[in-house]
Amino acid sequence: MKIRILVLILCALTQGCTYVDDYMLGKDNTPQPKELKEIQPKVKMAQSWTTPVGKAHKTNEYLNIKPAIRGDVIYTADASGLVQAVNRKDGQIKWSTALKNNIVSGPTVAAGYVAVGTNASTLVLLNQSDGKEIWQNKVSAEVLAPPAISHQKVIAKTIDGKVYAIDAVNGKQLWVADHGAPSLVLKASSSPIIVDDLVLVGFSDGKLDALELQTGRLIWQRSIAYGTGASDVERLVDIDSDPIISNNVAYLATYQGYVGALSLSNGQFIWRKPASVYKNMLLSHNNLYFTDSNDVLWSLNSSTGQVNWKQTSLKARGLTAPALVGGNLAVGDKTGYLHILSTQTGELLGRSQLSGGVTVSPSVSGKNMYVLTNNGMLNQLSVS
């Protein structure tokens, strides 16, 4: 079955925001970013260093290429095919590997490996210490979300609804599970999550599968949202936000569907609310934070789903998923601004502008942020 891929920018298509991939051409009705109002800064951001880790690329803003922090090193991937290890203290490059194909997801860094997906429908595994290629493995379609690595296995989900388990040592495919996919999907995707001996995978039809890690056998399946409407676009209910697992509860979100908490003990929803989300959520201190498809930031009580606050002053600015830095929230926007918000109230506490658009959520260690911009620069900023 041919899969059509939809590129979503800034807002729900049902509200007229229509920038799509090459199967659909037409006028771009993307709304103008909401004008920023003057604020009295309550936090300060200072930039320590910046270093090039790739090239400016028109597809950078659509890719799931968030830098990964491990110890004193931050690992980056760029659409041009460049994977690098960068010293967090001074921005110096430790190693650099140029792949033959463009990168569409990653890096995932674990167990001494670095994994990325390419536009040639290949998974590539590198050695974490020196960047040397260990293997490449051809799969059925693009891997648009960073794979998972655990128990010497690399687990990856392809855009056509397959899940692959690959031996990390030799690159051999261990099993493939075929869930399938609708005819139209968003150009976004959630990563597999490994929980004990299960792999939890969200799919483009709004279903969550639990697969046995060793065999790929389907253990159970839950429908998180159901597609409704007359058109393929109206029926989009992709699970593109990574499931968050805490205390035997899965926090889930879908596009044009719901955000909710699902008990892994009995498969029942603890709570569920209508929402449209396709970026990763953040769970911290009994609060669930997320950016919805209209660029409204929300805070919900993770136990009850009750709304703590919402921040609407950044609508249509192309916000990233939120990150936690120094006890506050940080989001980037497509015009290059970083915004700091209070976790308690959603109040805007500060902002800083970088040299390129910020469409990948900041990577954080303590009070330091590492921000990848669409012009291929990695920026280190401290928040105080």
From Swiss-Prot:
It is found in: Cell outer membrane. GO terms for cellular component: cell outer membrane. A lipid is attached at C17 (N-palmitoyl cysteine). Keywords: Cell outer membrane, Lipoprotein, Membrane, Palmitate, Signal. NCBIfam families: assembly_YfgL (TIGR03300). Belongs to the BamB family. This is Outer membrane protein assembly factor BamB. It comes from Legionella pneumophila (strain Paris). The lineage of its organism: Bacteria, Pseudomonadati, Pseudomonadota, Gammaproteobacteria, Legionellales.
